[in-house]
């Protein structure tokens, strides 16, 4: 809804006429490229648990907490599946912007018409104040779309009105879009940069992460899996995990589902990986 008012004078009396106009929402509720959240329905607990440890994990958790206190834009870098979206949600939940909406725009799913509306429609959420907007997978945008976004950010002073968070996949670090966005964010907007390490570089945290996920799947699936055989854990540790935490959760869910013994065997792990 949009409110308009104008002042009228009739028979020496002053009146204020208020018009309420109903216009179509910019986005549909089932649009996968655009989602609206608030502090109660953002999904950040998995990230907080998976990065709440020692070494690199503990430092990441501390950095997120400090970044949340700032008003500066944030650039989140990491491979596919490292939890960039959940990191953005956690920054939002711990920030002073948490009582306003959190707008998540998946740039890999957004259509050209929708993108044009976001940057030009008067009802666009990008015109709001004190909200948080998260451009996920921004490296999926075309160079033309990126240029339009940069122009919009500058002309509307978006970073003075809202909290801007952008994520890039380092799997695409050799693409022009990645370098263009990173340069703009770091050099032009003086953003804060959060680097999420891949799972293969977090060997010290691996057993703790798997124990956490095993417990969750035991509860949700009604199982009582204690852990892994020695050889099975060695197999898990030696695997490269190209899709990182997302892949680990998927694999563990399958392992818990098909395992009938207290410990997951090496043969079972080999069958799934």
Where are these regions (language model features)?
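Short, flexible helix-to-coil linker/hinge segments that flank and couple to helix-turn-helix
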Residues: 211, 262-273
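Beta-strand residues that line the small-molecule/cofactor-binding core
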Residues: 1-2, 15, 102
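A short, hydrophobic, proline-anchored segment that marks a local hinge/packing element in signaling
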Residues: 2-11, 198
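Sensory coupling linkers of modular signal transduction proteins
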Residues: 8-57
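Conserved AAA+ ATPase core "coupling" helix
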Residues: 111, 176-218, 246
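AAA+ ATPase active-site-proximal loops
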Residues: 38-176, 199, 218, 222-261
């Amino acid at each position: 809804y949009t409110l308009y008012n104008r002042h009228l004078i009739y028979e020496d009396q002053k009146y204020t006429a208020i018009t309420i106009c109903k216009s179509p929402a910019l986005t549909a509720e089932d649009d996968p490229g655009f989602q609206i959240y608030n502090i109660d329905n953002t999904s950040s607990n998995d990230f907080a648990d998976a990065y709440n440890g020692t070494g690199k994990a503990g430092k990441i958790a501390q950095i997120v907490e400090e970044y949340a206190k700032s008003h500066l834009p944030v650039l989140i870098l990491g491979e596919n599946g490292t939890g960039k979206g959940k990191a953005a949600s956690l920054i939002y939940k711990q920030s002073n912007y948490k009582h306003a909406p959190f707008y998540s725009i998946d740039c890999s799913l957004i259509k050209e018409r929708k993108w044009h509306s976001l940057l030009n429609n008067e009802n666009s959420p990008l015109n709001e104040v004190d909200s948080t907007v998260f451009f996920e997978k921004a490296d999926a945008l075309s160079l033309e779309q990126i240029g339009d976004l940069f122009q919009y950010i500058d002309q509307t002073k978006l970073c003075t009105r809202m909290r801007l968070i952008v994520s890039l996949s380092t799997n695409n670090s050799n693409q022009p879009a990645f370098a263009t966005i990173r340069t703009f964010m770091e050099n032009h907007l003086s953003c804060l940069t959060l680097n999420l390490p891949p799972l293969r570089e977090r060997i010290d945290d691996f057993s703790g992460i798997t124990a956490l996920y095993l417990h969750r799947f035991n509860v949700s699936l009604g199982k009582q899996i204690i852990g892994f055989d020695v050889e099975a854990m060695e197999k898990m540790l030696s695997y490269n995990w190209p899709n990182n935490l997302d892949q680990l959760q998927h694999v563990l869910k399958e392992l818990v589902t098909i395992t009938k013994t207290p410990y997951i065997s090496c043969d079972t792990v080999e069958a799934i990986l």
